[in-house]
Amino acid sequence: MEGNIQLALICVGAALSIGLAGLGAGIGIGSVGQGACMGLARNPEVQPKLMVFMILGMALAESIAIYGLVISLILLYANPLLG
């Protein structure tokens, strides 16, 4: 019985890990996109330079979701807590 509760809590932790990481990444990417659109509307001449920084910012924000996915996969498949 105790193993089932521990496994259920691990699954909840994995779900929270990927869910919250995805939420944070979505907010970050939205913020980067909003800033890029506002900057492009103010000064259209800087579009090539702005695109580079926008893509870099979105990639860094997306890395948060990838870290959450890695943590979830470790919890589900290579869990050191189950022994």
UniProtKB/Swiss-Prot annotation:
The portions of this protein that span the membrane are 9-29, 51-71
Cell membrane in keyword set? yes
Q: List, alphabetically, the CDD domains matched.
A: ATP-synt_Fo_c
* Protein keywords: ATP synthesis, Cell inner membrane, Cell membrane, CF(0), Hydrogen ion transport, Ion transport, Lipid-binding, Membrane, Transmembrane, Transmembrane helix, Transport
Q: Which domain of life is it from?
A: Bacteria
**Cystine residue pairs:** none
Q: By its UniProt entry, which InterPro entries does this protein fall under?
A: ATP_synth_csu_bac/chlpt (IPR005953), ATP_synth_F0_csu (IPR000454), ATP_synth_F0_csu_DDCD_BS (IPR020537), ATP_synth_F0_csu_sf (IPR038662), ATPase_proteolipid_c-like_dom (IPR002379), F/V-ATP_Csub_sf (IPR035921)
What residue stretch is flagged as signal peptide? none
User: What Pfam families does its record include?
Assistant: ATP-synt_C
Q: Does the keyword tRNA processing apply?
A: no
The UniProt site entry described as Reversibly protonated during proton transport is assigned to E62
A single Gene Ontology CC annotation of this entry is: proton-transporting two-sector ATPase complex, proton-transporting domain
* Gene Ontology molecular function, alphabetical: lipid binding; proton-transporting ATP synthase activity, rotational mechanism
Location(s), subcellular: Cell inner membrane
What this chain does, per the record? F(1)F(0) ATP synthase produces ATP from ADP in the presence of a proton or sodium gradient. F-type ATPases consist of two structural domains, F(1) containing the extramembraneous catalytic core and F(0) containing the membrane proton channel, linked together by a central stalk and a peripheral stalk. During catalysis, ATP synthesis in the catalytic domain of F(1) is coupled via a rotary mechanism of the central stalk subunits to proton translocation.
Q: According to its UniProt record, which protein family does this protein belong to?
A: Belongs to the ATPase C chain family.
Q: Which HAMAP family match?
A: ATP_synth_c_bact (MF_01396)
Subunit (UniProt) = F-type ATPases have 2 components, F(1) - the catalytic core - and F(0) - the membrane proton channel. F(1) has five subunits: alpha(3), beta(3), gamma(1), delta(1), epsilon(1). F(0) has three main subunits: a(1), b(2) and c(10-14). The alpha and beta chains form an alternating ring which encloses part of the gamma chain. F(1) is attached to F(0) by a central stalk formed by the gamma and epsilon chains, while a peripheral stalk is formed by the delta and b chains.
Record protein name field: ATP synthase subunit c
Q: Organism source for this protein? A: Desulfotalea psychrophila (strain LSv54 / DSM 12343)
Q: What is the lineage of its organism?
A: Bacteria, Pseudomonadati, Thermodesulfobacteriota, Desulfobulbia, Desulfobulbales
